[in-house]
């Protein structure tokens, strides 16, 4: 059976809710941990929830870390969701220092426990936030966010955030009590989303359709 997108099964992640969202958008989807199946797919999704170290362990124990890196090098579209986005970068400070996949230079750092005013706020960051254009980005044309309007809201659940080494990797930000957080990142054919498109209503479905259109 030909497929439109493969979802990586590495023992962690909201695989089936992601699958349902892609199928709702008309995609033929396969969930697999078979390297041959994953590498032959036209698009690849790396989902994930939970701790960074557990996610990387799930990938490396199955040797799927190599698969993700090889796929990224193939120029075919790759999407990391939530923990999947975080694992795309170089390192994480979550419960120690851990190596990531290193596909997009950057690190995962804790969300500051205070607002910019110094007042404490709730961690994890849970809820809806509007997507914001980074200062040096004129628009989302030519990306999977094309067609969205700044302020369109997406759903996030996280205590850690990606800090790209270069701000040009930022595709969208969100604001949490004055703290600017990377909501989406991009390096060529590789995208990462800190939010959950499968839980983000019509906005999320439009992003999924954008990914399927690449």
Locate the predicted segments by residue.
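Acyltransferase
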Residues: 2, 190-214
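N-terminal beta1-alpha1 ligand-phosphate binding loop
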Residues: 5-26, 198
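Structural signature of beta-strand start/N-cap positions in the alpha/beta core
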Residues: 28, 43, 77-79
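Short acidic low-complexity segments
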Residues: 29-40
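Pocket-forming structural segment of enzyme catalytic cores
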Residues: 93-175
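Beta-strand-turn-beta hairpins that frame and shape the catalytic cleft
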Residues: 151, 186-190
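Short, surface-exposed beta-strand/loop micro-motifs that present aromatic residues
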Residues: 179-186
């Amino acid at each position: 059976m030909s497929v439109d997108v493969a979802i990586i099964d590495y023992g962690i992640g909201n695989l089936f809710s992601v699958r349902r969202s892609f199928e709702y958008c008309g995609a033929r989807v396969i969930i697999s941990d078979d390297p041959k199946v994953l590498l032959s797919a036209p698009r690849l999704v790396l989902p994930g929830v939970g701790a960074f170290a557990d996610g990387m362990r799930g990938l490396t124990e199955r040797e799927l870390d190599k698969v993700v890196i090889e796929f990224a090098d193939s120029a075919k579209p790759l999407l990391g969701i939530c923990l999947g986005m975080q694992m795309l970068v170089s390192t994480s400070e979550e419960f120690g220092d851990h190596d990531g996949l290193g596909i997009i230079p950057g690190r995962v750092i804790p969300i500051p426990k205070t607002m910019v005013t110094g007042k404490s706020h709730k961690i994890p960051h849970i809820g809806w936030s509007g997507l914001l254009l980074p200062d040096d980005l004129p628009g989302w044309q030519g990306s999977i966010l094309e067609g969205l309007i700044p302020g369109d809201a997406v759903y996030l659940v996280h205590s850690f955030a990606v800090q790209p080494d270069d701000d040009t990797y930022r595709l969208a930000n969100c604001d949490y009590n004055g703290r600017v957080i990377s909501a989406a990142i991009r390096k060529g054919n590789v995208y990462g989303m800190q939010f959950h498109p499968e839980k983000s209503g019509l906005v999320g479905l439009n992003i999924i359709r954008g990914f399927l259109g690449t």
